[in-house]
């Protein structure tokens, strides 16, 4: 069986700068947001993921950036930006995003949010991002920035899917 290759860059953004990251710490500037988008647009990326990793989130500023990006570029877009309310999810989707990314840490605060969003936009529009690490034979998932709790990753993925996630993004931080 031949599997179709897809190019899906995952861009970590703070303001108008794209970074590569390692273990939650920005460590290398990749470039200015729009020049990086131009590059992936011309190299025919199949989809682009944008995650706002700034510590002080400015949702309205980020939302404006998403609107500019969706007007200029025509590839599918997944957006992650600390979406913690139904209203924020609606705004991101109405700005032109094809999918939204929810951090699995959101379940600690409001585990019903994913099912509410899924009922409106469909599970195909919901990605849940799980940051995890393995230490001494145990599995841990992130519940916020650098705070991890011990939890079985497979069970957590099942929980996310049962509550409306259409896709799971696993990020190893080991």
Model-derived features with residue positions:
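N-terminal beta-alpha supersecondary unit
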Residues: 18-60
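Short, acidic/polar
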Residues: 28-41, 85-91, 148-159
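A structural motif
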Residues: 45-46, 74, 97, 165
């Amino acid at each position: 069986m031949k599997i179709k290759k897809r190019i899906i860059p995952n861009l970590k953004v703070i303001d108008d700068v794209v970074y590569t990251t390692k273990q939650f710490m920005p460590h290398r500037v990749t470039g200015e947001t729009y020049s990086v988008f131009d590059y992936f647009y011309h190299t025919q990326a199949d989809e682009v993921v944008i995650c706002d990793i700034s510590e002080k989130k400015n949702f309205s500023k980020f939302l404006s950036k998403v609107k500019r990006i969706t007007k200029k570029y025509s590839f599918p877009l997944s957006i992650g930006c600390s979406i913690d309310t139904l209203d924020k999810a609606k705004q991101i989707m109405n700005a032109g995003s094809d999918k939204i990314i929810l951090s699995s840490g959101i379940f600690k605060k409001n585990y019903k949010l994913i099912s509410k969003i899924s009922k409106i936009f469909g599970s195909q529009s919901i990605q849940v991002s799980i940051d995890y690490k393995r230490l001494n034979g145990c599995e841990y998932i992130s519940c916020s920035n650098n705070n991890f709790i011990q939890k079985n990753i497979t069970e957590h993925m099942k929980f996310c899917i049962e509550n409306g996630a259409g896709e799971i993004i696993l990020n190893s931080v080991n």
